[in-house]
């Protein structure tokens, strides 16, 4: 065995072995319990970052641990390879997205292999290949046949100069990223999938997700947003027209003093014909940012339409206002406004001098709305026959009256909206729909799938090549001329079913049901919490669609979810002569002064620029504070990087990158290697004879088996990998100091090291693989079982008892583990410190906590 730990040499050799023996390639085996471990697949951006490394290390640790439990473990990998960054890179280089994407895949694949992740590479998929998206297109046509797909107009970001649709990321301060033209909202036809048909099931089945983080489940419940309320009809005064509103607070309806409608509401557009002010307001609203964050932050504005609505219960007329906080594509496009009991309505009413009428008051106090709305539930007053009712009684009574008069009905609504899957981009899967000469829209026939995206294109940054190439859209259906859809799928489509394709990646069908139902659901899914409401919801939705089309049996795609925290690093900048911040890589920084807590006070870069230290922040290109995994692996080895990633923080918390801690991880592996080397150098060992061990040897063996039990529990149940590693480190401290003179000393060391390398195998697999062999084992470590704690070793022969007199420590005694209370008392009273502090006193009470404490009360 070589004396020095040489990670590059060891890791290359072990990785070659895994590749040659196809160690991690698996097939279905009904005689073995399966375990499907999956980390969210990467976008091939060019290089792995530390966030990737953390995600995939966690997944690999779980997968390797489960393998040593004797399970049939599937851990696949692939590439979420469609998307806007490839288009942007192609525009920048006047090239095509495909070569850029495939080059990045090749590079990142080598990086993943370099880190020693145990993937079944035979199942590798790339979502930009026709072999993959063909089945996505096929599935979409099946959903269309089931009535789950429809087309309607929806708003997009539009650049009038380039005459093109922009993604949200391409809108900078309201302008086009390329030509700086002001972006407007434009209505264009788009395809939608009816996720709302599954809203109830998506919500109720959250209760099945026992092993998902509560935070993710809460976020999904809120995103789906089920509410119970009443939809009621308001008649427009002096007109045959009417409109509906929906409210979850019908108890406040008697306090309605105005109605707010969306600028795009038909009533507003009609009224605008006679109001230039309203027409201008409608135009202004058309170009407004309607994201939730923008809506929450913007100034609430409105214009009176001149129209009035008739209150469905009182018959009173209330003004109708067009307001920028009401959206036409959300709810009914109209809301009843009760300023006394809604803060937004209150502020709007104050601003425009509208009436405020209180109708709800606290049970035990008078209503005070002099400074703000009263938004709590309470008791109705000023509400005619509903006076004195509480929320639920008022809800029921108002519902009954509106229903009886045909003016309203109880209704369940959802915040969730149908999924718009059309993207006016090029680098995505073509939507498999065609328009016939008579305008009829039909799915592409199955025998014409896949609709292949041409890859040999040049991006000009203005129009999608498949929109610009009029010939590409031309096709024939049953001999009749037709035009293909030139929109492509939202890339969330590809990531919504990739986990299932891994089960049968080469099947000439979307899924092989037998294989899919062997592997699914995923046993452990790992990814960032930022995906809680988009990917993870679509992922669940698609699984139910797959089930309802007969391809899978289960209701949910993943049993257990782990959401790992971000990786943070120090961030520094200086301000250049133009007043702009220039972010400097931590690798280019010299810290000149720190405070008493070790925080940076003064730092400069290699050019002498004085830097501002902004603290730890998420590694990002924008702050130039990313650390290249390749550099760290070259410097310390993959196992060191993996060990640091798992030890530095619990997996769901943020991890602060500190190279000094990476060095600490490296020192630990070198120490482990040295202990093993010194042990192996002493030659072969005899078998361990547990019965002949002395007290110190038994104590060391007890610590070993306690560690085995704790590490298994920390990894499997608690997923506290950092505390598992800490336990092994503590044990190694003991082993380093353990005697090795006798044959049984060395036999015990052999048992301990054989266990330690298996405990660490999921985390530092290259080192563990090598040490396992050096310890004289013929089998490869992947083919052995996780160590089991010897229960008999955990039984203590003796106990250390603390002896107190009047609550103060006076002695420590060692007694047999099965000693009686009387024997412990006798031994305790015989101690010199006890005699001294009880002499001449009367013993009033003796308290014995078995195996721990003897307290003598005397005065």
From Swiss-Prot:
Gene3D superfamilies: 2.20.28.290, 3.10.20.590, HUPs (3.40.50.620), Isoleucyl-tRNA Synthetase, Domain 1 (1.10.730.10). One of its GO terms (molecular function) is leucine-tRNA ligase activity. Its EC number is 6.1.1.4. InterPro entries: aa-tRNA-synth_I_CS, aa-tRNA-synth_Ia, Leu-tRNA-ligase, Leu_tRNA-synth_edit, M/V/L/I-tRNA-synth_anticd-bd, Methionyl/Leucyl_tRNA_Synth, Rossmann-like_a/b/a_fold, tRNAsynth_Ia_anticodon-bd. One of its GO terms (cellular component) is cytosol. A motif ('KMSKS' region) lies at residues 618-622. This is Leucine--tRNA ligase. It comes from Shewanella woodyi (strain ATCC 51908 / MS32).
């Amino acid at each position: 065995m070589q004396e020095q730990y040489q990670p590059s040499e060891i890791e290359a050799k072990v990785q070659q072995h895994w590749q040659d023996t196809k160690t991690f390639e698996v097939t279905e085996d009904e005689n073995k319990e399966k375990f499907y471990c999956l980390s969210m697949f990467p976008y091939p951006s060019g290089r792995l970052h530390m966030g990737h490394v953390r995600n995939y290390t966690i997944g690999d640790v779980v997968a390797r641990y489960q393998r040593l439990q004797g399970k049939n473990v599937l851990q696949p990998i692939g590439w979420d390879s469609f998307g806007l960054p490839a288009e942007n890179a192609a525009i920048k280089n006047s090239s095509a997205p495909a070569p850029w994407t495939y080059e990045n895949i090749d590079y990142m694949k080598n990086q993943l292999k370099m880190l020693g992740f145990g993937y079944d590479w035979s199942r590798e998929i790339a979502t930009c290949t026709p072999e993959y998206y063909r089945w996505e297109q096929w599935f979409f046509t099946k959903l269309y046949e089931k009535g789950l797909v429809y087309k309607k107009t929806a708003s997009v970001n539009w650049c009038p100069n380039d005459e093109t649709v922009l993604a949200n990321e391409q809108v900078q301060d309201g302008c086009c990223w390329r030509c700086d033209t002001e972006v407007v909202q434009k209505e264009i036809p788009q395809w939608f999938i009816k996720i709302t048909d599954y809203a109830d099931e998506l919500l109720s089945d959250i209760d099945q997700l026992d092993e998902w983080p509560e935070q993710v489940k809460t976020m999904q419940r809120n995103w789906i947003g089920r509410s119970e309320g009443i939809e009621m009809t308001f008649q427009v005064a002096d007109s045959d027209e009417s409109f509906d509103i929906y409210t979850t607070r019908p108890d406040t309806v008697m306090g309605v003093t105005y109605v707010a409608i969306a600028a795009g509401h038909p009533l507003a557009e009609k009224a605008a014909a006679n109001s230039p002010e309203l027409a201008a307001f409608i135009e202004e609203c058309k170009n407004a940012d309607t994201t939730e964050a923008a809506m929450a932050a913007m100034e609430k504005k409105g214009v009176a339409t001149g129209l009035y609505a008739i209150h469905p219960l009182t018959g009173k007329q209330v003004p109708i206002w067009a307001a920028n906080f009401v959206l036409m594509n959300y709810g009914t496009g109209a809301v009843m406004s009760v300023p006394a009991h809604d803060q937004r309505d209150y502020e709007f009413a104050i601003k425009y001098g509208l009436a405020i009428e209180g109708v709800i008051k606290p049970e035990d106090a008078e209503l005070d709305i002099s400074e703000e709305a009263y938004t709590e539930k309470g008791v109705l007053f000023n509400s005619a026959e509903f006076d004195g009712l509480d929320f639920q009684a008022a809800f029921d009574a108002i519902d009954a009256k509106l229903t009886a008069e045909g003016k309203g009905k109880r209704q369940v609504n959802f915040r969730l909206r149908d999924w718009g899957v059309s993207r006016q981009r090029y680098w995505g899967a073509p939507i498999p729909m065609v328009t016939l000469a008579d305008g009829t829209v039909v799915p592409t026939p199955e025998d014409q799938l896949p609709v292949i995206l041409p890859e040999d294109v040049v991006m000009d940054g203005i129009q999608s090549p498949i929109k610009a190439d009029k010939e590409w859209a031309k096709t024939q259906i049953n001999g009749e001329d037709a035009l293909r859809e030139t929109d492509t799928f939202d890339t969330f489509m590809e990531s919504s079913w990739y986990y299932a394709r891994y089960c049968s990646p080469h099947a000439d069908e979307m899924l092989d049901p037998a294989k899919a139902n062997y592997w699914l659901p995923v046993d452990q899914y790992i990814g960032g919490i930022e995906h809680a409401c988009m990917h993870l919801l679509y992922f669940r939705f698609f699984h139910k669609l797959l089930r309802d089309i007969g391809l899978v049996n289960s209701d949910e795609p993943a049993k257990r979810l782990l959401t790992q925290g971000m990786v943070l690093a120090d961030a520094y900048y200086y301000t250049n002569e133009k007043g702009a911040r220039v972010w400097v890589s931590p690798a280019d920084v010299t810290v000149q002064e720190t405070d008493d807590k070790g925080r940076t006070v003064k730092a400069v870069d290699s050019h002498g620029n004085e830097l501002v230290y902004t603290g730890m922040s998420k590694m990002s290109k924008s702050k130039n504070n990313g650390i290249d995994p390749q550099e760290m692996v070259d410097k310390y080895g993959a196992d060191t990087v993996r060990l640091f990633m798992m030890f530095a923080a619990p997996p769901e918390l943020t991890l602060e990158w500190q190279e000094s801690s990476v060095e600490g991880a490296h020192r630990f592996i070198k120490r482990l290697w040295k202990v093993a080397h010194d042990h192996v150098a002493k030659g072969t060992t005899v078998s361990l004879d547990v019965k002949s061990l002395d007290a110190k040897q038994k104590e060391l063996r007890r610590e070993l088996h306690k560690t085995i039990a704790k590490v298994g529990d920390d990894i499997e149940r608690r997923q506290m990998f950092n505390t598992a590693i800490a336990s092994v480190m503590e044990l190694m401290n003991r082993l380093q100091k353990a005697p090795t003179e006798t044959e049984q000393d060395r036999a015990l060391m052999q048992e301990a090291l054989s266990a330690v390398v298996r405990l660490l195998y999921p985390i530092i697999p290259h080192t563990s693989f090598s040490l396992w062999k050096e310890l004289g084992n013929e089998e490869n470590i992947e083919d052995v079982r996780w160590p089991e704690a010897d229960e008999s070793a955990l039984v203590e022969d003796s106990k250390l008892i603390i002896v107190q007199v009047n609550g103060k420590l006076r002695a420590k005694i060692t007694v047999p583990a099965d000693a009686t209370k009387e024997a412990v008392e006798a031994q305790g009273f015989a101690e010199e410190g006890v005699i001294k502090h009880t002499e001449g006193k009367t013993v009033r009470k003796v308290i014995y906590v078995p195996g721990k404490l003897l307290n003598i009360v005397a005065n």
